[in-house]
Every structure is written in C-alpha cells, then in structure tokens.
Amino acid sequence: MADAYAQFRSARDLLLTERTDYDRAIADYEPPRPADFNWALDWFDQVAADTTTGARDALKIIEADGTSHAVTYAVMSARSSQVAAWLTSIGAVKGDRLLLMLGNQVELWETLLACIKLGVVVIPATTLLTPADLDDRITRGAVSHVLTASADAGKFTEVPGDFTRVAVGEPVPGWTAYSESFSAAATGFVPPETAGGDDTLLLYFTSGTTAQPKLVEHTHLSYPVGHLSTMYWIGLRPGDVHLNISSPGWAKHAWSSFFAPWNAEATILVVNQPRFDAAALLATMAQESVTTFCAPPTVYRMLIQQDLAPWRGRLSLREMVGAGEPLNPEVIQQVQDGLGIVIRDGFGQTETTAQVGNS
C-alpha cells in the first residue's frame, strides 16, 4: 500500500511541477504501475489520513435553494468504508456488477468509492434511461445489484432479473433502504478480497450515437492513472475548488467530478440547477472561490449571454476548459474579453481518459 501510494504520488507531483513545461513533462513522465493498485484504498484513503487534506472538503454540493452539504476527505473516506462494509453484508462481493443510477448527490460518491474498495464493478447509468434501456443494460451488463434513487425505482418494476435492489431516499416496498448502511461498522473496514491492478473497475455503455451502445471496460490501474492526464490538462492543483458541469452516468462525470480533482487533492464543487441559470452560476462561482471550471460548449454559449466583464474582479478562476465538442472561436474570444481567461479545448472518449487537449 505504501509503495503504491508513493509511486502514484511521485507521478502526480511531477505533473504538477511540470504543468507549464509540456516538453519536459512528456520527456519525464512515466505512468505509475503499482501492483494490485486500488485507487480508493491506496490513494484516496491515504490522502484523507493526512491532517491537512483530511480536513479539506472533498465534495460540496449546492442545491437550487441555496442549501449546501460539504463532506471532508476524512469523512468521505470513513463513510465510504462504512458503505463498503454494508454492501458486503447484503451480499456484494468482488467481481459483482452494480448499476449505479443517481443524480449529483453525496451517495453517488460514497458508493463509487465503496465499490472500488470492494472490487465491485460499477456500471454508471444516467437517470434519463428508460425501462427498456435499463433492461438492456442489466441483461448485457450481467448486473447483480442496482442502486438508485427512490424516485427512479419505478423504472425497474418491469425489468426482470434476480438482482439486489437498493433505494436511496424514501422507503420503497421490496427494496433495501440505503439508509441501513449507517448501521454498519463505522471503523475497521478490511476488504474481504484484494481488488486492484488489472481487475475491472468500471463498465461504461457508450452513447450509442450511431449504433447500439457498447460496453467499455476500465481497470483499477488504467482509469485512475489515466486520469492523471486529465488532471494535467485541466490544470488542477491541491486545494483547488473545481466545478464541472456534467451529469452522472456519463464518462465525463467520472473524469472531472471524481478522479481528476481527487487525484489533485482538490475540492469537487457541484451546483444543482433544475434549469441552467448563468447569472446564478456565476454568483455561486464567486461565492465559492472556484479556481478551475469545466463545461460543455452549450454552457459557455449561455454564459456569454451575460455581461462577463463585471465578474472579472469577483471570480477566482485560473483555468477554464471545455469538452464534448469543439468551441467556436467567437465564444472563446468573448470569454477571454470578459474574464481574461482562454478556454482550452480537450478531447477524449468513453473508452479513454483525456487524449488531446490545449495545455
């Protein structure tokens, strides 16, 4: 564990040090390959054990009504271990496949970390999926467990299969309540089996733009290590407050709202808006001292409908990046004129981490 942590940190720190010297970073960087690497145990828990980082917010979610919920690294580490212990008690074992369909809520991050610790393979799913979509994913994904919000449990009523059903929120007849996880042992978690390295970590379904969605596999080593490139592209640093506009269930959410910021020991900020409100988002970004921002072109096109110049002195932004599709030069120029920051494009796929980007 100590060696895995040291290898990962050494590679991470090199990318932080050489962030502005691309040629040197290319020459010096060697992806770490620690044996049986389990990112949640060997990286996240070790980072959370540090007094300074442990007290830092790992996640902060701001709701539309202005209420917020923050979770420190130390609390997230402990709570995810508790959830892992509870998942074990209801039958989850290494290699099982769990379909995770939640919105931007704390339980999403807890569960994903818990599954990584256990070696349970996560199949992320967007809440936009229909019962027919879910039937297909559960069948082709060989799903053993489903964890979703109570409000979405009804989508599974007509979905056949012998799988554990866990509901987050109000009780649902026939479903196990996620709230029961608080009764599990809060300390002393030890994974029943070693999971890591080349073991499967995530199974994503592609978007299915031109054909039926296909399954894509990522391992415990390939995905977290791969997202060191995503961290480098975004320009994340320890202590940053990172805001990513993305929906859970898609790979971009794991990119920029999970692995990349936590690789950097940054705070993940989530702003839940039923309908996008550019002025409210800018106000929240100023209030929360957001330093790094990632969004699809659609968001940037709506942001430039605002007069950005007055925000220039109020925002703490250092980096702005876009992904999903190329940005129009006119949009990039308008943001630069208003905020003094050049939006940098990046490209990757469900099958990869960040592949190409303006650094």
Over which residues does each language-model region extend?
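Conserved AMP-binding/adenylate-forming core of the ANL superfamily
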Residues: 55-113, 130-135, 220-221
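Conserved pre-ATP/AMP-binding loop-to-beta segment of ANL
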Residues: 54-57, 173, 183-205, 212, ...
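Conserved AMP-binding A3 loop
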Residues: 69-74, 201-225
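ANL superfamily adenylate-forming
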Residues: 63-66, 145, 151-197
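Conserved AMP-binding/adenylation subdomain of ANL enzymes
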Residues: 224-241, 248-291, 306
